[in-house]
Amino acid sequence: EKDKLINIEKLLEKRVIGQQDAIEKVSKAIKISKAGLQDPDKPLGSFLFLGPTGVGKTELSKALAEYVFDNEKQMLRLDMSEYMEKHSVSKLIGSPPGYVGYDDGGKLTDSVRRRPYQVILFDEIEKAHPDVFNILLQILDDGRLTDSKGKIVNFKNTLIIMTSNIGSQIPIDDNFDYTTKKNLALEELKNHFRLEFLNRIDDIILFNKLSKENISAILNNQIQLIEKRVSSKGISIGFTDEAFKYLKEKGFDPLFGARPLKRLLQDEVLNPLSEVILDIGENIEDKLIFSKDKYGLVIANKNLRVLRS
């Protein structure tokens, strides 16, 4: 664990591409906390991740769960579009006595009671009802929360992360430094959030838009993950330069970050690959090559016999 924390910045950079500034700031805050220099009555850290869709906000949250808590599944994701109504607060802390769902408990409080060491991700926080922010203020202030049954839940070993794309539409010159960009975003945030809320967050972290070079690196990472999955079946896969270039070009969209690339890999790599594996079964060749023809990607065996086009 000690080595993980010392090298957390390098580990995060391998997994989350193109966000060096964000990773540096989060890593420093994590080290302060794990060294015991953070306020002991507050969560380990609290961050507001700002940036457009598909640039790595959720991926960094998962990576923090893995490197800080040893498992990326040590994360509770709460979609704030499901907490837009006043009554939805009861889903977080449980329904009041006498109401339907009282015995079920709250999704947030029950999760932290069962797993006190985890990342809690409030996704698209700007969509939450104001009463949700009152709950967040309690967590950020006191590191604890009282559920509907009057039981106190300790949040002092959690990482609180909120995401938003507020400010991502502001026309910002790429030559601006990080501080200038952050100040512009902060002015926009003040139009949406109360100052008492913003002031309680440890840091507001800006995420960059992804470049073509970033997409190329992300594609490499995704291919390695696919290779790892299929290797368990005794199969190896490869991509020609033309196939890699095709995926990189078609998967790049500056508006939606890496999301189009992941959908493309699902449609043009995983779906046809699964058909080949299911069709051929145990007789499958040990090496499959993805190449490019005029219609798209083609899967061939090591002797270049086409298996799927």
Across the structure, where does each feature detected by a protein language model lie?
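AAA+ P-loop NTPase nucleotide-binding core of proteostasis motors
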Residues: 1-309
